[in-house]
């Protein structure tokens, strides 16, 4: 472990001293630490501190048309280290719990005006403050010189490099489509040139120079020194490679994925991403698989495993299971333990311990996969993960939020309250206000900071550590919950038009509606309004007690959040392929499995007011098509955007989000839902594109009888 840390530190310093990047062969030549080729490539691939990208090079002396293009493998230094924006802003500024550098931005640019006057800069020029030293140590870069640190920040912190004008890069004329022209506060330079991808070369009509009068004047206004200007091109290119090529090329020599012989995938060969506060759904363990009822099977985007947790380590670009993960989980659930000692390990390696804070297994990365947090699912969902939140008292003991401790007043928030606030903070698009949670304990007021995992007394300034650990579930507990009766106590609340004799404990039943029934006619009329020339062959009601209960629970939650007001609920269409019908009936709509119906208004499940729109997505090799008429809790909606992965926050309300997105606020016809609990697949319509019903033997018999009776 010590040798790996030394190697990471040396590689980082070599790269930053060389302008943030080095060709792989040159890095090997300069490296003093004794590392073999395989060991170095594993280090670069697995530690999360570097990116290996391919960058085109052109042979010297070759013309643009006949240039002998080759490619070099470049290693770039990566870091999550950032400057604190609140510290740069107006007073009172940052409270000091940000885990980011308190440093002047213009010092990084090498051109702070206070350097020339000898006056003290309010934003700080001292890297050696207790706060900054702690931040540097946390990121493992406290050994870098000032110049090396500046290079690392410039190519990783997106707030530092000047913005490129995208309008300048579009349209004709000397300023492209930029209406501000010379008054534009962004740089007028070819964005493809900065990315190393401009195919026009010297004949490009966009500027390729930072030193022309317009660009230089702009850069001087922004405070960049002449030395930094001379390095800008390589820095922009480094930043582009880190942002856009790292995930695809960081694997130096990936191992081929082995065959998946069972539903429990022992090796996960997907791309490795650095840990983030929020758990991606693709790294969640499938709750339906644990209940042995996942209809998506191999197409399921969640992990299939027999436990609600899974401990793995990174080996050769693939995640592999750790041995004795029940013992690891039991230790991890204890907040007083920050590691577990290993005397033996999987795959023939020997490591000393598994560190829960750094998530390192010896020299390599480790991770814990788990089921969804219990606060995101209805109470009757089994084997969700109960996360417990603790704070450390003055005696070094961990106290659970909302529980009575010895000599401590009870907090006004529970673990569930903290968990909900934490997930809101982790959600995409959450603003800065979501990073803190205010509460009381006795007569004292506190603030919990999710970024730093600390709580602060707002009067005395006392700071305490905070910890989040799961409630332990043994394999025996899992078996017991799987086998026990998971039905809710009391009578089931079902629609009065459902068939009570067709309610399976798990799964669903399709009930074919009589064409003469009022229920059939209602569905037919909605469908027929925009598809009058198509023939409805069959309409079935979907009876899935599990999905219905979840839908009703979601409706109650939305109603509470809406101050008790009724939630906007609509009947909307969704066209699909026959291949996905049973999976949708079993587990609801999931665009990651069933496919996208567009991304214009966000990445979610699309529903339409008109059957004619959904028909375009009702794919079939025959004349027979499938379409759902679903109940959808659209709630409060907003116009969508292609970049949305969830609805945005409401204006002025950091923890309140819209419920869905639409194509038009004045006349919405398309709705995008990101949370599947807001949908219930109520009816399945099977229809034909033929305007006449297909002839069947029964029709011929009836016609024959009619003809005979007339003789």
From Swiss-Prot:
Coiled coil: none annotated. The lineage of its organism: Eukaryota, Metazoa, Chordata, Craniata, Vertebrata. Residues 308-371, 374-468 form the WWE domain. It comes from Mus musculus (Mouse). InterPro entries: ARTD-AVP, Poly(ADP-ribose)pol_cat_dom, WH_PARP12, WWE_dom, WWE_dom_sf, Znf_CCCH. Mono-ADP-ribosyltransferase that mediates mono-ADP-ribosylation of target proteins. Displays anti-alphavirus activity during IFN-gamma immune activation by directly ADP-ribosylating the alphaviral non-structural proteins nsP3 and nsP4. Acts as a component of the PRKD1-driven regulatory cascade that selectively controls a major branch of the basolateral transport pathway by catalyzing the MARylation of GOLGA1. Acts also as a key regulator of mitochondrial function, protein translation, and inflammation. PANTHER family: POLY [ADP-RIBOSE] POLYMERASE, PROTEIN MONO-ADP-RIBOSYLTRANSFERASE PARP12. Interacts with PARP11; this interaction plays a key role in zika virus suppression. Interacts with ISG15. Its main location: nucleus. PROSITE patterns: PARP_CATALYTIC, WWE, ZF_C3H1. This is Protein mono-ADP-ribosyltransferase PARP12. A zinc finger (C3H1-type) spans 103-128, 164-188, 189-211, 280-307, 281-306. It is found in: Nucleus; Golgi apparatus, trans-Golgi network; Cytoplasm, Stress granule.
């Amino acid at each position: 472990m010590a040798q790996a840390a030394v190697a990471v530190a040396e590689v980082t310093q070599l790269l930053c001293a060389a302008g943030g990047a080095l060709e792989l062969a040159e890095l090997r030549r300069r490296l003093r630490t004794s590392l073999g080729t395989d060991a170095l490539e594993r280090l670069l691939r697995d530690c999360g501190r570097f990116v290996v990208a391919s960058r085109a090079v052109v042979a010297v002396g070759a013309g643009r048309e006949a240039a002998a293009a080759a490619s070099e493998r470049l290693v770039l230094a990566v870091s999550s280290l950032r400057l604190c924006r609140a510290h740069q802003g107006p007073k009172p500024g940052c409270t000091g719990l940000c885990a980011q550098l308190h440093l002047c931005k213009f010092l990084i640019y090498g051109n702070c005006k206070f350097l020339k006057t000898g006056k003290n800069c309010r934003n700080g020029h001292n890297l050696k403050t207790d706060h900054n030293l702690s931040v540097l140590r946390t990121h493992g870069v406290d050994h870098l010189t000032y110049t090396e640190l500046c290079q690392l920040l410039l190519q990783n912190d997106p707030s530092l490099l000047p913005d490129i004008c995208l309008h300048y890069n579009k349209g004709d004329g000397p300023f492209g489509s930029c209406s501000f022209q010379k008054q534009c506060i962004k740089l007028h330079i070819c964005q493809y040139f900065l990315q190393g991808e401009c195919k026009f070369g010297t004949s490009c009509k966009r500027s390729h120079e930072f030193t022309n009068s317009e660009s230089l004047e702009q850069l001087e206004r922004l405070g960049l020194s002449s030395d930094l200007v001379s390095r800008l091109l390589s820095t922009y290119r480094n930043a582009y490679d880190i942002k856009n090529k790292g995930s695809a090329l960081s694997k130096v020599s990936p191992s081929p994925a082995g065959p998946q012989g069972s539903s429990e995938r022992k090796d996960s060969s997907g791309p490795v991403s650095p840990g983030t506060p929020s758990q991606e759904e693709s790294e969640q363990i499938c709750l339906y698989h644990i209940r042995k009822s996942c209809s998506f099977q191999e197409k399921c985007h969640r992990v299939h495993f027999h436990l609600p947790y899974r401990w793995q380590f990174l080996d050769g670009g693939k995640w592999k299971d750790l041995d004795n993960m029940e013992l690891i989980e039991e230790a991890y659930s204890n907040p007083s333990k920050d590691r577990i000692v290993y005397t033996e390990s999987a795959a023939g390696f020997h490591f000393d311990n598994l560190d829960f804070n750094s998530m390192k297994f010896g020299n390599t990365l480790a991770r814990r996969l788990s089921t969804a947090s219990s606060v995101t699912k209805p109470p009757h969902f089994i084997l969700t993960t109960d996360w417990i939140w603790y704070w450390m008292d003055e005696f070094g003991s961990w106290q659970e939020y909302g529980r009575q401790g010895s000599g401590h007043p009870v907090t006004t928030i529970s673990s569930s309250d903290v968990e909900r606030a934490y997930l809101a903070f982790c959600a995409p698009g959450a603003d800065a206000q979501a990073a803190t949670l205010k509460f009381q304990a006795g007569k004292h007021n506190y603030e919990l900071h999710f970024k730093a995992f600390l709580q602060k007394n707002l009067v005395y300034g006392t700071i305490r550590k905070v910890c989040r650990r799961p409630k332990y579930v043994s394999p025996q507990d899992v078996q017991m919950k799987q086998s026990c009766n998971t039905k809710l106590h009391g009578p089931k609340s079902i629609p009065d038009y459902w068939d009570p004799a067709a309610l399976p404990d798990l799964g669903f039943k399709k009930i074919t509606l009589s064409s003469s029934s009022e229920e059939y006619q209602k569905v037919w009329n909605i469908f027929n309004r925009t598809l009058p020339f198509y023939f409805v062959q069959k309409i079935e009601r979907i009876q899935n007690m599990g999905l219905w209960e979840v839908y009703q629970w979601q409706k109650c939650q939305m109603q509470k959040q809406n101050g008790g007001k009724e939630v906007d609920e609509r009947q909307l269409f969704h066209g699909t392929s026959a291949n996905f019908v049973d999976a949708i009936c079993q587990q609801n709509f999931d665009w990651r499995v069933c496919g996208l119906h567009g991304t214009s208004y966000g990445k979610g499940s699309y529903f339409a007011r008109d059957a004619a729109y959904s028909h375009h997505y009702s794919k079939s090799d025959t004349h027979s098509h499938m379409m759902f008429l679903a109940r959808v809790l659209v709630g409060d909606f907003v116009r969508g955007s292609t970049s949305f992965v969830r609805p945005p926050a409401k204006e002025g309300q950091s923890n309140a989000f819209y419920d869905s997105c639409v194509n038009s606020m004045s006349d919405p016809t398309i709705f995008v839902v990101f949370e599947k609990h807001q949908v219930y697949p109520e009816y399945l319509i099977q229809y034909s594109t033929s305007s006449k019903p297909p002839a069947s033997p029964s029709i011929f018999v009836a016609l024959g009888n009619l003809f005979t009776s007339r003789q």
